[in-house]
Structure formats: structure tokens, C-alpha cells
């Protein structure tokens, strides 16, 4: 089975890595593909696509993952056609809860199943309407977001506890996110 982890990765953080690791441990995944959205249709990005690809390659270097740039604007377009074969699209509980608002969620599930990482002590997202096309697995993940990482960089604060060390080094080396403001990466309510 192929596991697919998609996102803007602006920047990738420890939560993304924990999600990938938990999926690899809990599910019969023999191939993990990390799709870095080049031009996502659901949100603005701060760093350019090639930079985010580099950051994701650094973040997932310790895992058996293939990190690639995805030119599709929406998840449905990336998975349509079934070219990933038997596949699950891996998301955390927050994205799982937002799944019904994604562009063509039923079409996404025609081609892949949704694998939702849920945290102990938190209610799982209500996705029962999708039946066996949605599976869940236990996730022990740090509470971190890309917004939090960018805000810390903007404030001149260290991010070594939020992102893998090579990502922190690349952010510093490239001078990323220093001019970040919340409005620079606002989310469109119609996502993925």
C-alpha cells in the first residue's frame, strides 16, 4: 500500500514527521510519498515551491519517503486516476475534520482511502458518512503548526523544538519567514 502525505510544508515541522512516522508504524504502508503542493489551491504560501521541497526533503530524510513536488492545486487532482494504486492519504485529525470541505471529497475517496491520525484523549473527527473509506490510527504528535513556526522566526525566537534540526538550519541559512505576517498565508475556507 502507498501512503500519501500532502501539504504545503511551509515549513514542514515535527508534527508532520510524527504523522508520517506513526502512519508507517500503524499501517501496512510499503511506500510513502510526500507531495509538496507547488501551487496549492486552498491557501497562499510564503516560501516558494523549490524551497519548500528542499525543506521537506530535509524533514523526511530519516524516513523511507519519496518527497516530490506536486503541480496539482487540489488533492482530488493529485489522486484522480488511481495512479498511486492501493493508497491511503494520510492526514492529522484537524485536516480529517476539515475533509468534508475539501474539493470533491467523494471523488478523493474514489481513488484513495483517508487515513486519519487521532490523538489519545481527543475525539476523532466525524467522518462516519464515508464508511470504510476512512481509517484511523493512533498518533502521538507534538502540538505544533507551520503558523507557529513562522511566527517564532518573525519574532527572532528559536524553532529547534518545533522543526527537525536540518529544517531549522535551512530556515536560518536562507533567511526564511523573517517578514512573515499572518495575512501572508491566510487559508481559504474551501480547502484541498
What role is predicted for each listed range?
Residues 1-192:
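Nucleotidyltransferase catalytic core that binds NTPs
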Amino acid at each position: 500500500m502507498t501512503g500519501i502525505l500532502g501539504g504545503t510544508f511551509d515549513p514542514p515541522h515535527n508534527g508532520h514527521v510524527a504523522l508520517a512516522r506513526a502512519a508507517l508504524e500503524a499501517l501496512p504502508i510499503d511506500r510513502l510519498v510526500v507531495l509538496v503542493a507547488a501551487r496549492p489551491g486552498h491557501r497562499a504560501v510564503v516560501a516558494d515551491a523549490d524551497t519548500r521541497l528542499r525543506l521537506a526533503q530535509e524533514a523526511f530524510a530519516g524516513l523511507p519517503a519519496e518527497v516530490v513536488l506536486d503541480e496539482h492545486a487540489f488533492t482530488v487532482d493529485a489522486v484522480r486516476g488511481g495512479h498511486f494504486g492501493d493508497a491511503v492519504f494520510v492526514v492529522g485529525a484537524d485536516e480529517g475534520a476539515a475533509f468534508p470541505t475539501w474539493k470533491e471529497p467523494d471523488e478523493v475517496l474514489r481513488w484513495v482511502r483517508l487515513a486519519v491520525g487521532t490523538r489519545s484523549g481527543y475525539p476523532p473527527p466525524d467522518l462516519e458518512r464515508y464508511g470504510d473509506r476512512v481509517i484511523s490510527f493512533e498518533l502521538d504528535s507534538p502540538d505544533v503548526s507551520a503558523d507557529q513556526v513562522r511566527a517564532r522566526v518573525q519574532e527572532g525566537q528559536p524553532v529547534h523544538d518545533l522543526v527537525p534540526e536540518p529544517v531549522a538550519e535551512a530556515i536560518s541559512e536562507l533567511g526564511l519567514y523573517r517578514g512573515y505576517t499572518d495575512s501572508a498565508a491566510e487559508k481559504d475556507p474551501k480547502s484541498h
